[in-house]
A protein has these predicted regions:
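A compositional/structural signature for long, glycine/proline-rich flexible linkers
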Residues: 4-304
Length: 304
């Protein structure tokens, strides 16, 4: 997004949303191509990852103001825009497309030849985010090595990618995750200038299941203590099982599991997901650099 300077130190930005498919010949800054789907509906998601400390959830920028330009050039704002766009209409996207339907999920976790901890592994097994077929492949073992990236839920994109693992408390009440942390600019306290870093932002989240896609909680990069060698240690458990030394003062961060597990059928299930946002071009260990499942450990090395 290209920004223009307004009054004082305020930057203004304008994004044009078009009901068109992008083509390889189009490379226009500040254009978002959002073709309609069922019943001529379009869906736009405005995401803010982390505002600075003591700043409101918009990052101090307020919500963007929509302006609707009609075919005759007339521009509508405010309530008129909402009425014409019918912004209160029900979402036409099938929720089955956003997650796994409950009946299918129950079948996947109850396969007759699998243990009651399935598909959790001990030690945990990590998966990159591929297409929907490979999402189901976490349960069936059938992952297409040539599947495309940046699909399969949780809104990945060119700048934001995940790796994930499914856990089960029947393997143990506490999981310790240790790895090397990508460097990030320390801006949470309001620092305006940023130093060079591996990624813009990274986080580790715990989720319930791919049925309800509910997030339990997340840790972002500046919340996680890093040792002198650049490594983090994170304990993951229910509140009741939290180790006494899982506090920042002891160099161990803590991430909670939900008390009701996957929120559906198994109280012991949790999904954890690492996110890398906007990696530097020269950072060779980012999630974005992993194109195939079998490359994961080789590419990420100590960072996973």
């Amino acid at each position: 997004v290209v920004r223009s300077r307004g009054l004082g130190d305020v930057y203004k930005r304008q994004i044009n949303v078009l009901n068109e498919n992008p083509t390889t010949s189009q490379n226009n800054d500040n254009y978002l191509y959002t073709p309609e789907y069922r019943k001529r509906q379009q869906l736009i998601v405005y995401r803010i990852y982390l505002p600075d400390q003591n700043i409101d959830i918009t990052g101090g920028a307020k919500l963007p103001q929509p302006v609707l330009t009609l075919s005759n050039g007339t521009k509508l704002r405010g309530k008129q825009t909402c009425e014409i766009l019918n912004t209160s209409q029900p979402l036409q996207v099938s929720f089955d497309a956003l997650g796994i339907p409950p009946n299918e999920y129950r079948r996947l976790i109850s396969q007759p030849d699998k243990p009651d901890t399935w598909p959790a592994h001990n030690p945990p097994k990590w998966f990159i985010q591929l297409d929907r077929k490979s999402l189901i492949g976490m349960y069936t073992g059938k992952i297409d090595p040539n599947a495309p990236r940046s699909e399969g839920g949780f809104y990945p994109n060119l700048d934001n990618q995940y790796i994930r693992s499914i856990l089960n408390r029947k393997h143990g009440k506490v999981l310790i995750v240790r790895g090397k942390a990508p460097t990030t600019a320390k801006t949470y306290s309001g620092t305006s200038s940023t130093e060079e870093s591996n990624v813009r932002y990274w986080s580790l989240c715990s989720n319930q299941s791919f049925v309800n896609t509910r997030v339990n909680d997340c840790l972002f990069d500046e919340e996680v203590p890093i040792d002198k060698n650049g490594f983090y240690t994170i304990a993951i458990s229910r509140v009741e099982d939290r180790p006494r030394n899982a506090v920042n003062e002891c160099g161990i961060a803590w991430l909670p599991m939900a008390d009701d597990g996957d929120g559906m059928f198994d109280d012991d299930v949790t999904i954890i997901q690492f996110r890398h946002l906007l990696p530097a071009d020269n950072f060779e260990h980012s999630i974005q650099k992993v194109e195939r499942q079998d490359q994961l450990r080789k590419v990420m090395g100590p960072y996973m």
